[in-house]
UniProtKB/Swiss-Prot annotation:
HAMAP family in alphabetical order: EF1_beta (MF_00043)
Gene Ontology molecular function: translation elongation factor activity
Function of the protein: Promotes the exchange of GDP for GTP in EF-1-alpha/GDP, thus allowing the regeneration of EF-1-alpha/GTP that could then be used to form the ternary complex EF-1-alpha/GTP/AAtRNA.
Name of this chain's protein: Elongation factor 1-beta
SMART domains attached to this UniProt entry: EF1_GNE
Alphabetical list of NCBIfam families matching this protein: aEF-1_beta, PRK00435.1
């Protein structure tokens, strides 16, 4: 089976959320679930930041939903946007 690269935009639930702490918890929660290809903080504007996350998963039904469910359990994550899904 092929692999899929999935990009997510993780928005904090509040402007007071420390995105570096959120990033650490994302790495911890996804350990053993999928391979993290890239994770970085990006600016929205006015001092607000979000986490851009790229993961590699198997190309099978339900994988993106499974990752979203794990990400929703991360403290401080308010919104999860799946930005791109592509075969690699």
């Amino acid at each position: 089976m092929a692999d899929v690269l999935v990009s997510f935009k993780l928005l904090p639930s509040d402007s007071d959320v420390d995105t570096s702490v959120m990033e650490s918890e994302v790495k911890e929660k996804l350990n053993g679930v999928c391979k993290i290809n890239n994770i970085e903080e990006k600016d929205i504007g006015f001092g607000l930041k979000y986490i851009h996350l790229e993961v590699i998963v198997e190309d099978k039904e339900g994988e993106v939903d499974r990752i979203e469910k794990v990400l929703s359990m991360v403290k401080g994550v308010g919104e999860i946007n799946t930005e791109n899904v592509s075969l690699i």
